[in-house]
Swiss-Prot record:
Described purpose of this protein according to its UniProt entry: Involved in the regulation of the intracellular balance of NAD and NADP, and is a key enzyme in the biosynthesis of NADP. Catalyzes specifically the phosphorylation on 2'-hydroxyl of the adenosine moiety of NAD to yield NADP.
Enzyme class: transferase
Naturally occurring in which organism (per UniProt): Salmonella schwarzengrund (strain CVM19633)
UniProt-recorded name of the protein: NAD kinase
A Pfam family that the UniProt record links to this protein: NAD_kinase
Molecular function (Gene Ontology), one example: NAD binding
């Protein structure tokens, strides 16, 4: 065992039984290496582990030096929103589909993780968005997002009329099916599908991408991440929502606005030493290879 990490948390809710084998293999291996290991409560229950330290995501964030998320990007997003509040590093073993955020190969995870535990890794900070539903600036409901905050109708698709203010200055009005407000991390997710630009993770920027706008002049907009975005609605409807990372939904009631800004804290995401963002883009998005 080395001094880079002493206490390691294992998190991630598996959707398939095969993913549990990765959790169990990782737990046994870390224990054999002499690390203190905390297992997320649900995982410990499903693995039927007895007499092992367990904890919630918040407890793991408070006690561990490193959290290993086993699963796909959805698992990473769900865990990271909580873990980002604490001084903990996070890395992912991909048991999902694309795996933009979980870049350890499950077939070689132990070797790659061994290198990381010995200090051979790349560290980066990813900022989050904070979304508030408020009335006359009195906060009523709040959540955070690693990828994006999306304004959309609730149950039935329909056109939304709204105004966008940047730092309390009117930016534009729009009639569309919604709006995607994305971080650089989320620029390769829902935002990309809607025609938004890809932003490298180190950029301090936020993108605003319209969803099916009812005018050809509506285009994606990139603003500084220090800006505050306010959404106001011309026709008050009770079926509007904002969703955070497609996992948490906040309803918008009559007379309420939405405020979106960069969080005060960030996610400490680490990668293997040979990680390359552009290699990941090429592999995951099927970009063409070099010509010469």
């Amino acid at each position: 065992m080395n001094n880079h990490f002493k206490c390691i948390g294992i998190v991630g809710h598996p959707r398939h039984p095969t993913a549990l084998t990765t959790h169990e293999m990782l737990y046994r291996w870390l224990c054999d290496q002499g690390y203190e290991v905390i297992v997320e409560q649900q995982i410990a229950h499903e693995l039927q582990l007895k007499n092992v330290p367990t904890g919630t995501l918040a407890e793991i964030g408070q006690q561990a030096d490193l959290a290993v998320v086993v699963g796909g990007d959805g698992n990473m997003l769900g865990a990271a929103r909580t873990l980002a509040r604490y001084d903990i590093n996070v890395i992912g073993i991909n048991r999902g589909n694309l795996g933009f955020l979980t870049d350890l190969d499950p077939d070689n995870a132990l070797q790659q993780l061994s290198d990381v535990l010995e200090g051979r890794y790349i560290s980066e900070k990813r900022f989050l968005l904070e979304a508030q539903v408020c009335q006359q600036d009195r906060q009523k409901r709040i959540s955070t997002a690693i990828n994006e905050v999306v304004l959309h109708p609730g149950k039935v698709a329909h056109m939304i009329e709204f105004e966008v203010y940047i730092d309390e200055t009117f930016g534009f009005s729009q009639r569309s099916d919604g709006l995607i407000i994305s971080t650089p991390t989320g620029s390769t997710a829902y935002s990309l599908s809607a025609g938004g630009p890809i932003l490298t993770p180190s950029l301090d920027a936020i993108t605003l991408v319209p969803m099916f706008p009812h005018t050809l002049s509506a285009r994606p907009l990139v603003i500084n991440s220090s800006s505050t975005i306010r959404l106001r609605f011309s026709h008050r409807r009770s079926d509007l929502e904002i969703s955070c990372d497609s996992q948490i939904a906040l309803p918008i009631q009559e007379g309420e606005d939405v405020l979106i800004r960069r969080c005060d804290y960030h996610l400490n995401l680490i990668h293997p030493k040979d990680y390359s963002y552009f290699n990941t883009l090429s592999t995951k998005l099927g970009w063409s290879k070099k010509l010469f």
